[in-house]
């Protein structure tokens, strides 16, 4: 199961863990993903999407229909 946002396609990013002695080691910053169920009135159905908290805020602001239209234009199969 990929740790990717179903709407934006964003996955984990890489960076460094920095200790007190300033020694750096590689690490991954994982997305804050949640599996949510959304109702799409125009299609009269529910969809289950794995979305990050950032995407969830965008959906609350713009609405699920507008966000899905943008994602489909960018080539994501939602």
From Swiss-Prot:
One of its GO terms (molecular function) is structural constituent of ribosome. Keywords: Ribonucleoprotein, Ribosomal protein. Residues 14-24 have a biased composition (Polar residues). GO terms for biological process: translation. Coiled coil: none annotated. This is Large ribosomal subunit protein bL28. Belongs to the bacterial ribosomal protein bL28 family. Residues 1-33 are annotated as: Disordered. One of its GO terms (cellular component) is ribonucleoprotein complex. It comes from Salinibacter ruber (strain DSM 13855 / M31). NCBIfam families: L28. PANTHER family: 39S RIBOSOMAL PROTEIN L28, MITOCHONDRIAL, LARGE RIBOSOMAL SUBUNIT PROTEIN BL28M.
């Amino acid at each position: 199961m990929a740790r990717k946002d179903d709407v934006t396609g964003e996955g984990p990013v890489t960076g460094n863990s920095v200790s007190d002695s300033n020694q750096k080691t590689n690490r991954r910053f994982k997305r804050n993903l949640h599996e949510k169920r959304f109702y799409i009135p125009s299609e009269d159905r529910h969809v289950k999407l794995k979305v990050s908290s950032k995407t969830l805020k965008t959906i609350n602001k713009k609405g699920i229909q507008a966000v899905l239209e943008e994602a489909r234009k960018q080539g994501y199969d939602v």
